[in-house]
């Protein structure tokens, strides 16, 4: 847990003004996202049955919040979602979406094992979206075009927020640069993946870091962990901004083209979890029963934090924080909700 305390921090908005700005950002951005990406708002679950394999296993070590239900057998464990990465692809089929059609949801999750800092909370709120593509569109061009559309939605939201709250909006970069995790390792082999991200974000201001999950050539280790059963590790990435108030990068979106039957087999083998292939969701992919798709998540609280120049995500969402973090934040004029 690393807490960054910016020197001489003074919020420019009161708590009530901040809350009003949060509402405006959320409503504005989701309208922009729906229009620019061509996706439809859909209702989504907060929990799923463990046996379906629909929950996001993240890096494979995080424990989901799990419980049983009075109306179901005790052995049928229910889990609060970590994300809706797999559910969305299934929903595209279930609800009859066609080529280049898609959905977005308001996703709320609990990640009990999250390492807490200025950007990370156990409460996760994001716009989760998913869109059907053709198999031949599973390529880098499709990925980069989609990233630029999401960035356009963010920039258009920034402009409107700035007009509404002049002097209280953080100025973003004007374009997205693209780089792979291997290119980062080749350029800075002696730095950690996190340090490389900070370096490239500071240089470029806005960068999409591609190909996350597979082992890198020099270190033999992944740049970062990714579950093997939703993103194709060769066609995914993170949208990262340089955030001057904290002298740090901030990840706003993780997204990617989803696994095909071929890449699912390959990635399950690399991750040493081939037993997952027996789960219903995975069987549908392997049998070609689910549409090819691209999708991702966009952090709601993080976007609000970024656009409003806040020092801690707890200024734009209500969560629980360790007592020592609360005390340090109070001493630095950071008011956690």
From Swiss-Prot:
One of its GO terms (cellular component) is cytosol. Gene3D superfamilies: Bira Bifunctional Protein, Domain 2. Its EC number is 6.3.1.1. One of its GO terms (molecular function) is transferase activity. CDD domains: AsnA. Keywords: Amino-acid biosynthesis, Asparagine biosynthesis, ATP-binding, Cytoplasm, Ligase, Nucleotide-binding. It is an enzyme of class 6 (ligase). InterPro entries: aa-tRNA-synth_II, aa-tRNA-synth_II/BPL/LPL, AsnA. Pfam families: AsnA (PF03590). The keyword Ribonucleoprotein does not apply. It catalyses: L-aspartate + NH4(+) + ATP = L-asparagine + AMP + diphosphate + H(+). GO terms for biological process: L-asparagine biosynthetic process. Its main location: cytoplasm. Pathway: Amino-acid biosynthesis; L-asparagine biosynthesis; L-asparagine from L-aspartate (ammonia route): step 1/1. It is found in: Cytoplasm. Belongs to the class-II aminoacyl-tRNA synthetase family. AsnA subfamily. This is Aspartate--ammonia ligase. It comes from Lactobacillus helveticus (strain DPC 4571). The lineage of its organism: Bacteria, Bacillati, Bacillota, Bacilli, Lactobacillales.
């Amino acid at each position: 847990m690393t807490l960054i305390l910016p020197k001489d921090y003074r919020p420019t908005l009161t708590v009530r003004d901040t809350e009003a700005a949060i509402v405006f950002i959320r409503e504005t951005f989701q309208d922009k996202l729906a229009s620019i990406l061509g996706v439809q708002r859909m209702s989504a679950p907060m929990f799923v049955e463990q046996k379906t394999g629909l929950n996001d296993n993240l890096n494979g070590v995080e424990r989901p919040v799990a419980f049983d239900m009075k109306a179901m057998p005790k052995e049928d464990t229910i889990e609060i979602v970590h994300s809706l990465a797999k559910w969305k692809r299934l929903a595209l089929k279930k609800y009859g979406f066609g080529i280049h059609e898609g959905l977005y949801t308001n996703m709320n999750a609990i990640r009990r094992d999250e390492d807490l800092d200025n950007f990370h909370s156990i409460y996760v709120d994001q716009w989760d979206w998913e869109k059907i593509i053709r198999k031949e569109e599973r390529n880098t061009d499709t990925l980069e075009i989609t990233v630029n559309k999401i960035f356009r939605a963010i920039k258009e939201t920034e402009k409107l927020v700035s007009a509404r709250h002049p002097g209280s909006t953080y100025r973003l970069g004007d374009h997205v640069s693209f780089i792979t995790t291997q290119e980062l390792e080749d350029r800075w082999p002696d730095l950690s993946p996190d340090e490389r991200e900070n370096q490239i974000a500071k240089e470029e201001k806005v960068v999409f870091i591609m190909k996350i999950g597979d082992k890198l050539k020099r270190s033999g280790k992944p740049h970062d962990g990714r579950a093997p059963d939703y993103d194709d590790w060769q066609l995914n990435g993170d949208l990262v901004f340089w955030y001057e108030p904290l002298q740090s990068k901030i990840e706003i979106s993780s997204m990617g083209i989803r696994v095909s039957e071929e890449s699912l087999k390959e990635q399950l083998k690399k991750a040493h979890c081939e037993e997952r292939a027996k789960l219903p969701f995975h069987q549908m992919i392997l049998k070609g029963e689910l549409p090819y798709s691209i999708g991702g998540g966009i952090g709601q609280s993080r976007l609000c934090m970024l656009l409003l120049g806040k020092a801690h995500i707890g200024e734009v969402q209500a969560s629980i924080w360790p007592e020592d973090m609360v005390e340090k934040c109070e001493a630095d004029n950071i008011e956690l909700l």
